[in-house]
Amino acid sequence: MSYYRRRLSPIKPGEPIDYKDVDLLRKFITERGKILPRRITGLTAKQQRELTLAIKRSRLVALLPFINAEG
């Protein structure tokens, strides 16, 4: 059984998650562009939902890539 190191959230409770804050959103996606799960990010359920929506919005307006092309 493997254990994940729970990361402390850089987002304070009640702090808004903005889709234009690309530096913050990049902390919650993998090198390939996938959204990290809640058990790794340490966010609350509500924060994780808001984060997912913000990442998807920023992908639609081309602030973040859908996938990171390698090579």
From Swiss-Prot:
Q: Which GO terms describe its biological process?
A: translation
Task: Identify the keywords attached in UniProt to this record, alphabetized.
Answer: Ribonucleoprotein, Ribosomal protein, RNA-binding, rRNA-binding
Q: Which InterPro entries match?
A: Ribosomal_bS18, Ribosomal_bS18_CS, Ribosomal_bS18_sf
Q: Name one GO cellular component term.
A: cytosolic small ribosomal subunit
GO molecular function list: small ribosomal subunit rRNA binding; structural constituent of ribosome
Q: Which domain of life is it from?
A: Bacteria
Q: Which residues cross the membrane?
A: none
Subunit organization? Part of the 30S ribosomal subunit. Forms a tight heterodimer with protein bS6.
Q: Which family does it belong to?
A: Belongs to the bacterial ribosomal protein bS18 family.
Q: Which NCBIfam families match?
A: S18
Protein role: Binds as a heterodimer with protein bS6 to the central domain of the 16S rRNA, where it helps stabilize the platform of the 30S subunit.
What is this protein's name?
Answer: Small ribosomal subunit protein bS18
Organism this protein belongs to = Nostoc sp. (strain PCC 7120 / SAG 25.82 / UTEX 2576)
